[in-house]
Regions:
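Short alpha-helices
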Residues: 125, 130-203
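Short glycine/serine/threonine-rich phosphate/pyrophosphate-binding segments
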Residues: 29-35, 97-101
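Short glycine-rich anion-binding loops that position phosphate/pyrophosphate groups of nucleotides
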Residues: 25-27, 94-97, 133-135, 254-255, ...
Length: 364
C-alpha cells in the first residue's frame, strides 16, 4: 500500500467544526462504508457531521447505520442550507460533481441542473475529494487520489491512522464495520488484483476493533428480495458470448424489472458473473433506465474496462468501470455500439500484449 500523505488535511480538520460528507449516486459498499467510517471518526474528535446522498441507502447496507443512523437522503427544502453552512465538504469515492447528482449543483457550476430549475451558486467553502478512480474533474479545492488503492475505504483508514497522533479520535465498532465493508466489497471479497497482504492486515485491525466478517457477508450478499433471483434468471437468459467467447454481454430491460418486482439496485453484481466462464476477459452489462441506459463493465488482465466506459462518456478503474447514456437509443443501436467499442478495446489489448512480447524478444 502506497503512502498517500494526508497531513495537509489536518489543519483543515482541526480548525473547522462542521462538515458535510457525500458520495456518488446509487452508493455502493465502498461509498457508504467510507462515508460512515469517516463521519464516525470526525464525531469522535468533536466535529459536527452530516452525511447527505442523492440516493437512499440500498437495503443490503442498511445495517451499517446501526446503532446510529448516519446517512440522509437529499431534500431540496433542507439540505442546500446545510451545505452552505458547512465549513468543509468532503466528496468520497467519486471525483466528478455530476455523479453526486442533486448535491452536485451546490458544488460546481459544471454540474447539470434539471430543465426549468434555478441554477444555484456553488458553495464557497473548501471541497475535498478523497477517491481512487481515474481522471478527476476539476471542481474541488484539493484532491487526495490514489488509483492504486483497493478502495476509498482503505484511504479513509490511512487518513485516520495518519491523523490520530495529531488529532486523536477513535475508530468505533460502527466505524470499523463500515470501513471493513468498504474494503471487502470493493475488492470483490478480496479477489480483485490490488488485494495484497496489506489489505488483510488492515482488515485484521478492523476486526480487532469490532468488524464482524460473518455478519458482513450475510447482510451484504444474503438479504436479497425474491425479485432479485427472478431478475438474475432473466439476466442469464440474455447472456451472449462474442469475439471467440472473450466477451460476455447481458441486458435487463425496464419491463423485466417490473415483472420481477425488482429495483434497479438489484442488478448489482450481475456484471461479474460471466467471469465464472474460462476465457472471458470483458463483461458488459446493460441496464435500461427510464431515461437512457446504464453500462457496467469489468475486465481481466490488460483489457481496459475504463477505456470501454470512456467511449460512452464514463469512467472508473482499469478493470472496473461504468457509464450512463442519457440519450434513449433503441436497444439495437446500443448493442451495436457496445459490440463495436468492445471489439476495439480487445484489439487494443492484443496490440499491447504483442508489443510486450516483442519487447521481451528484442531485449539483449
Amino acid at each position: 500500500m502506497a503512502a498517500l500523505n494526508f497531513e495537509p488535511l489536518f489543519p483543515l480538520i482541526r480548525d473547522n467544526q462542521s462538515f458535510v460528507i457525500t458520495s456518488h449516486v446509487n452508493p455502493d459498499g465502498d461509498a457508504l462504508g467510507s462515508e460512515i467510517g469517516f463521519a464516525e471518526w470526525l464525531r469522535s474528535i468533536g466535529k459536527k457531521v452530516r452525511v447527505i446522498n442523492h440516493s437512499p441507502t440500498p437495503y443490503n447496507y442498511e445495517f451499517l447505520e446501526k446503532p446510529n443512523p448516519v446517512v440522509e437522503q437529499f431534500d431540496a427544502a433542507i439540505h442546500p442550507d446545510v451545505i452552505y453552512a458547512a465549513d468543509v465538504v468532503f466528496v468520497l469515492d467519486v471525483n466528478d460533481a455530476e455523479r453526486v447528482r442533486s448535491l452536485g449543483r451546490y458544488l460546481s457550476r459544471g454540474a447539470a441542473v434539471p430543465k426549468g430549475e434555478p441554477i444555484p451558486d456553488p458553495t464557497t467553502k473548501p471541497i475535498i475529494v478523497i477517491d481512487h478512480h481515474l481522471n478527476p474533474k476539476e471542481f474541488a479545492k484539493e484532491y487526495f487520489i490514489d488509483t492504486d488503492a483497493t478502495s476509498t475505504g482503505e484511504l479513509i483508514v490511512r487518513l485516520i491512522r495518519q491523523a490520530q497522533p495529531t488529532l486523536g479520535g477513535t475508530i468505533s465498532q460502527q466505524a470499523a464495520q463500515a470501513l471493513y465493508v468498504a474494503i471487502m466489497t470493493d475488492t470483490g471479497s478480496f479477489k480483485f488484483p490490488r488485494t495484497d497482504s496489506g489489505t488483510f492486515r488492515m482488515c485484521a485491525d478492523l476486526l480487532d476493533l469490532g468488524a464482524d466478517p460473518v455478519r458482513t457477508y450475510d447482510e451484504v450478499f444474503n438479504t436479497s428480495p425474491p425479485g432479485r433471483l427472478l431478475l438474475l434468471r432473466e439476466c442469464l437468459n440474455s447472456l451472449e458470448y462474442h469475439f471467440d467467447s472473450r466477451m460476455a454481454f447481458q441486458v435487463i430491460m425496464q419491463s423485466q424489472l417490473a415483472t420481477a418486482g425488482a429495483a434497479e439496485e438489484d442488478v448489482d453484481g450481475f456484471v461479474q458473473m460471466p467471469f465464472q466462464v474460462r476465457g472471458i476477459v470483458l463483461s458488459v452489462f446493460l441496464l435500461e433506465l427510464k431515461e437512457g441506459w446504464k453500462l457496467s463493465t469489468r475486465s481481466k488482465g490488460d483489457v481496459s474496462a475504463a477505456a470501454f466506459a470512456q467511449t460512452f462518456g464514463g469512467n472508473g478503474h482499469f478493470n472496473a468501470a461504468g457509464a450512463r447514456v442519457h440519450v434513449k437509443h433503441d436497444f439495437t443501436e446500443m448493442k451495436r455500439q457496445i459490440l463495436a467499442n468492445a471489439a476495439q478495446v480487445l484489439a487494443d489489448a492484443d496490440l499491447r500484449a504483442q508489443a510486450a512480447k516483442d519487447a521481451v524478444i528484442a531485449a539483449p
